[in-house]
């Protein structure tokens, strides 16, 4: 009896894996390219790149980042967005009306991966590339803030051990770390990183600032998709190294103007 149940369970698992493998890709991924690469041999990282769709406020673009770009095939037909997973960091993937997207990411040396997963988890596309430029700096501390309402404007605020404050109006810290400037407006995620975090206590806050739509920003309590917004903070230490570790914090947001301390860490 147990043997028969085991065979049945194994058969079910095999069918699920086969269905997942045969599922249509959720997106056409145009970049990055898988395989071996050396940033010193190209000028890609010297070019200015910005997120797309363009956020409500254009804060320009930044250098030294690689574009994760492509097109979501079933744009506008899904209730939930697909998920973009970069080096294990999961975040909602939103596109424009035609499904096009571009997410800049500062990849470090070594093995890197990009994966797009359908909302139901049945389709997975994954590519991997190896960055051979060992002079590139890796983020010793990275924070990724995501939330589940694309019409809500949610902000991350980071306070450094010396009192520096990184947020949407002043995204960079005096010592060089800070928020990606084009991640601070729109549906997110918001990304903070530093290659040399100061020793001491770091504070990470989340603020439900307002909402936005085609007409711009607004403070209408009903102009969003969810009554309860779930914000998740992912903290990555020593990213893409043998010493990498992660922490996850989830906070509910109910009202515009709400401010909450998500995490306090000592580095």
Predicted feature locations:
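N-terminal signal peptide c-region/cleavage motif recognized by signal peptidases
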Residues: 18-20
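Short, compositionally biased P/S/T/A/G/V-rich stretches that sit at domain boundaries
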Residues: 23-62
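Aromatic/hydrophobic beta-strand junction motif of beta-rich domains
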Residues: 66-76
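Short beta-strand segments within Ig-like beta-sandwich modules, predominantly Fibronectin type-III
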Residues: 90-98
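Surface-exposed, short loops/turns at beta-strand junctions within beta-sandwich domains
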Residues: 104-111, 198
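Short, aromatic- and glycine-rich surface loops/edge beta-strands on solvent-exposed regions
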Residues: 109-121, 204
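Edge beta-strands of extracellular beta-sandwich domains
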Residues: 123-133
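Intrinsic-disorder/low-complexity signal
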Residues: 136-267
């Amino acid at each position: 009896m147990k043997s028969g149940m085991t065979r049945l369970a194994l058969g079910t698992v095999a069918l699920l894996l086969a269905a997942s493998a045969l599922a249509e890709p959720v997106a056409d991924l145009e970049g990055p390219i898988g395989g071996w690469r050396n940033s010193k041999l190209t000028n890609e990282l010297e070019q200015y790149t910005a997120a797309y769709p363009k956020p409500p406020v254009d804060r320009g673009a930044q250098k030294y980042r690689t574009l994760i770009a492509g097109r979501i095939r079933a744009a506008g037909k899904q209730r939930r967005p697909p998920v973009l997973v970069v080096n294990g960091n999961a975040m909602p993937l939103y596109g424009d009306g035609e499904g096009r997207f571009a997410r800049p990411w500062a990849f470090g040396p070594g093995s890197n991966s990009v994966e797009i997963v359908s909302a139901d988890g049945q389709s997975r596309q994954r590519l991997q590339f190896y960055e051979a430029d060992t002079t590139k700096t890796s983020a010793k501390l990275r924070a990724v803030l995501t939330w589940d309402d694309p019409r809500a404007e949610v902000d991350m605020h980071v306070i450094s051990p010396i009192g520096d404050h990184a947020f949407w109006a002043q995204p960079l810290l005096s010592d060089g770390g800070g928020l990606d400037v084009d991640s601070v407006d729109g549906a997110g995620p918001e990304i903070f990183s530093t290659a040399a975090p100061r020793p001491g206590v770091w504070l990470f806050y989340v603020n439900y600032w307002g909402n936005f739509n085609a007409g711009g920003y607004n403070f209408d309590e009903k102009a969003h998709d969810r009554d309860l917004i779930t914000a998740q903070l992912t903290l990555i230490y020593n990213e893409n190294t043998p010493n990498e570790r992660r922490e996850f914090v989830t906070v509910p947001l109910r009202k515009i103007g709400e401010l909450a301390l998500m995490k306090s860490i000592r580095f």
